[in-house]
């Protein structure tokens, strides 16, 4: 009986791992997912200060050719962020129906207006608020920060 149970569990594990390997995001979706992670996810960060925004925007390569005017960093575990993709679909700003909403801890970084590329300056605002992200793929992963 114990051997059968062990074999059944091993078979279930093998099938699960195979299934996960078969449903990886496409190359394009994976690139968009990696870009989303680079631009918007900082699970370890506390954020909230102007210096945080100045450093992170430069570190994440959003200030080299021009100063990105606005960006949001999400301070949640990636699995919490990915779980937003499991919520009901809502319209995105562009009209597509692949957006989802959730409440997360964020730091919004807004460019001050007196910035120049390579020396961009930001004002920070930390909050817990509703965000909307676009998700794609099977399984769905976040690919765009909508609002």
Curated annotation (Swiss-Prot):
Residues bearing the modification Pyrrolidone carboxylic acid: 29
Residues that hold dUMP according to the record: 35, 40, 68, 71-72, 145
Subcellular location: Secreted
Any one GO molecular function term: RNA nuclease activity
Span of the signal peptide: 1-28
Superkingdom in the source lineage: Eukaryota
Keyword tRNA processing attached: no
CDD domains, per the entry: RNase_A_canonical
SMART domains reported in the protein's UniProt record: RNAse_Pc
Active-site annotation: 40, 144
Class of enzymatic activity (EC top level): hydrolase
InterPro entries reported for this sequence: RNaseA, RNaseA-like_dom_sf, RNaseA_AS, RNaseA_domain
GO biological process: antibacterial humoral response; cellular response to starvation; defense response to Gram-positive bacterium
E.C. number: 3.1.27.-
Gene3D superfamilies: Ribonuclease A-like domain
A single cellular component GO annotation: extracellular space
Disulfide bonds: 53-109, 67-120, 85-135, 92-99
Keywords assigned by UniProt, alphabetized: Antibiotic, Antimicrobial, Disulfide bond, Endonuclease, Hydrolase, Nuclease, Pyrrolidone carboxylic acid, Secreted, Signal
Role: Cleaves preferentially after uridine bases. Has antimicrobial activity against uropathogenic E.coli (UPEC). Probably contributes to urinary tract sterility.
Family of the protein in this entry: Belongs to the pancreatic ribonuclease family.
Protein known as: Ribonuclease 4
Lineage of the species this protein comes from: Eukaryota, Metazoa, Chordata, Craniata, Vertebrata
